[in-house]
């Protein structure tokens, strides 16, 4: 639900989530946004706060992202 001019005040909320993937940072972001969208209504965007990799046996095993997900509260 985009913010519409002249439609009154919208209240947004931001939650922080962590998501991970064994494939890539992009996959971790997609999984995190998909999961958040299943629980939260009106997700508007996500900001990647931080990202890191977990290394096992000298190789990247996990791509981890820390996201701030914004959603609009509905009355």
Feature-to-residue mapping (PLM):
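Short beta-strand/turn micro-motifs at beta-sheet edges
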Residues: 1-7, 56-58
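Short, well-ordered alpha-helical segments
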Residues: 10-44
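A cross-kingdom feature marking charged/low-complexity
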Residues: 52-75
């Amino acid at each position: 639900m985009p913010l519409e001019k002249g439609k009154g005040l919208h209240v947004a909320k931001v939650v922080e989530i962590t998501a991970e993937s064994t494939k890539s940072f992009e996959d971790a972001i997609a999984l995190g946004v998909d999961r958040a969208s299943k629980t939260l209504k009106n997700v508007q965007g996500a900001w990647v706060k931080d990202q890191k990799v977990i290394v096992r046996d000298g190789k990247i095993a996990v791509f981890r992202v820390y996201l701030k997900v914004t959603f609009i509260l509905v009355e």
